[in-house]
């Protein structure tokens, strides 16, 4: 009896694994995968160099290295709450994209591999979820109810 129970348990587990393997994940990158293949997004920095106007910026990147904001590397501000001279600008990003029509009715997720500090994401003008607070680690938003098929414009900001 014990062997039969073990066999049936293994059989059920195997069937579950086979069923899971039939699910196909499709990807559409909205950014590049590194400095060799950046994708141009609309960008505005709220302070520092080249601020207050929309421009193009490669994503992924560091905006200071592309001439925006306040370059502040090497400043001695550790251990202070908010010392004088530390930049407090924000970067605003926008990107329009289309999704394949065959994705309609499927789960759509925006996956971020990393973002420095606080990140609020909107898709077509609606918040994708709660604000990401942290550093360079992966976070994901399910935006299935925020994308509209049949229109060409999808905006992530």
What is each of the regions a protein language model found here?
Residues 44-48, 88-157:
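Accessory beta-strand-rich segments of carbohydrate-active enzymes
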Residues 21-111:
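Extended carbohydrate-recognition surfaces in non-catalytic/accessory domains of CAZymes
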Residues 6-7, 28-31, 142:
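General helical structural elements
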Residues 15-16, 37, 151:
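Generic detector of short, well-ordered, non-transmembrane alpha-helical segments enriched
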Residues 1, 52-55, 75, 123, ...:
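Generic cytosolic/nucleocytoplasmic N-terminal low-complexity/intrinsically disordered segments
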């Amino acid at each position: 009896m014990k062997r039969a129970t073990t066999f049936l348990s293994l059989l059920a587990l195997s069937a579950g694994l086979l069923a899971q393997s039939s699910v196909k994940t499709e990807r559409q990158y909205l950014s590049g995968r590194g400095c060799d293949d950046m994708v141009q997004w609309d960008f505005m920095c709220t302070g520092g160099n080249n601020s207050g106007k929309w421009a193009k910026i490669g994503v992924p990147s560091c905006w200071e290295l592309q001439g925006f904001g306040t370059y502040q590397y090497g400043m001695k501000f550790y251990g202070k709450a908010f010392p004088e001279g530390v930049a407090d600008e924000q970067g605003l990003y926008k990107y329009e994209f289309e999704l394949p029509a065959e994705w309609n009715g499927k789960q759509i997720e925006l996956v971020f591999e990393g973002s420095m500090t606080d990140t609020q994401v909107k898709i077509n003008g609606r918040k994708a979820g709660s604000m990401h607070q942290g550093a360079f680690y992966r976070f994901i938003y399910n935006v299935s109810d925020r994308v509209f098929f049949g229109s060409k414009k999808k905006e992530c900001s």
